[in-house]
């Protein structure tokens, strides 16, 4: 499958509200981190998912129980440059600042490299 081998960057909108429905208040932000990792693993097909510190701050901005309903994410599939890496690729997830995350479509971001 050639599609999984290439390096790509996409922007997604994740609806955390439906993923955190029914989760107790003191576990909402930690569960949001787990759900974002699961989302990135599903869409990028990599087991190694890394979150940007800015994304962690965006999740925890309103405290443990005040997680945003929707977040706009930029997920990049990159090559693992480490010598003894278990996986050849990893996903890097970072937040995108938008006024409102409602109604936005998934977009492939062109890299200027």
Swiss-Prot record:
GO terms for biological process: cytoplasmic translation; regulation of translational fidelity. The keyword Ribosomal protein applies. It holds the Pfam family Ribosomal_L31e. It is found in: Cytoplasm. Signal peptide: none annotated. GO terms for molecular function: structural constituent of ribosome. Transmembrane segments: none annotated. This is Large ribosomal subunit protein eL31A. The gene is RPL31A.
